[in-house]
Amino acid sequence: MLKVLVGAAAILTLASAAFAGDQGDPGQNCDGSTLEMVDCLKAKTAQWDKRMTIAYQQAMKDAGQQQREQLRTAQRLWIQYRDANCLYYDMGEGTIARIDAGECMRSMTEARARELEGAGHHSQ
């Protein structure tokens, strides 16, 4: 029974590493220990956060007054939602929870950055 549990844990760890390694910058794989994977996901999230900030600033410049106010409100609420949503994963059990939470932050931040990058195409 112990061998089965150890084998299952190893498979889950490898699957998580493979999943994390497929995300974001193709040149950067999030392989290694849990700590290394979490640090890698944090670095990728920081890259996407920078892109999101730049896109947000550009969208604010491009928007009219009413749109700017609404975008500011939406962005603040989106950040609260992202943080609360990813905290759900972080509160899970085991070390996989830290990886799941890191991937949640990375993927949601990437999606929002891409959405804001396309925002200028929808205004006017």
Predicted regions and their residues:
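Bacterial N-terminal signal peptides that target proteins for export
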Residues: M1-A8
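N-terminal signal peptide c-region/cleavage motif recognized by signal peptidases
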Residues: L14-A18
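N-terminal alpha-helical modules
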Residues: F19-Q124
